[in-house]
Amino acid sequence: EHTYGEVNQLGGVFVNGRPLPNAIRLRIVELAQLGIRPCDISRQLRVSHGCVSKILARYNETGSILPGAIGGSKPRVTTPNVVKHIRDYKQGDPGIFAWEIRDRLLADGVCDKYNVPSVSSISRILRNKIGSLSQPGGPYDGGKQPPPQPALPYNPLYQYPYPGPMDPRAAKMGADPPGPVPAAHVGLPRSWPSAHSVTNILG
């Protein structure tokens, strides 16, 4: 049987509905890692710009160049074995970077260049699955807010629980000897803010 291919605008041949060959997919990723822009990769390999962008986006998300299964589930790149090795690397060296973990996975033969997780995937694993183990109080332990601070005596809720500064009774309190005021202030820190402030003003 003949495979009928179509020619895109760049002169490249493709089969509609079928994924791009893995050799070309790998070449796209390699060129991108060399710093070549997707539009230049597109022209060089005669692959549409949308296809190049899609393959690179998938690689950045999953770390895999392999196409998704047609009509099936996507292959899991972060298998339990990979997660275990990432956890071991992190526990052995808490300061290790995600890209260093990626290099270790390749060097130790845990993954090959076709299925090694991307740096962003490793970072997500560290954050979601290992963060609570490796950094219990670190930046990955998010979501916990510090306990609220107690309201200050001058909070509007406690502004003038007793006679206000314009009330003659407050003026009378301010005219009293200042001796009992500190004691009252210490004993009832939220009950005498206005009397204390009036005493300070009147000397």
Curated annotation (Swiss-Prot):
GO biological process: embryo development ending in birth or egg hatching; regulation of transcription by RNA polymerase II; sclerotome development; skeletal system development
GO cellular component, one term: nucleus
Main localization, broad class: nucleus
Compartments it resides in: Nucleus
Stretches the record annotates as PAI subdomain: 6-62
Annotated region (RED subdomain), positions in chain: 81-129
Entries under SMART domains matching the protein: PAX
Region (Disordered) location: 133-155
DNA-binding segment(s): 3-129
CDD domains: PAX
Signal peptide: none
InterPro entries for the chain: Homeodomain-like_sf (IPR009057), PAIRED_DNA-bd_dom (IPR043182), Paired_dom (IPR001523), PAX_fam (IPR043565), WH-like_DNA-bd_sf (IPR036388)
A single MF term (Gene Ontology): DNA-binding transcription factor activity, RNA polymerase II-specific
Keyword vocabulary terms for this entry: Activator, Developmental protein, DNA-binding, Nucleus, Paired box, Transcription, Transcription regulation
Function, as annotated: This protein is a transcriptional activator. It may play a role in the formation of segmented structures of the embryo. May play an important role in the normal development of the vertebral column.
Annotated protein name in UniProt: Paired box protein Pax-1
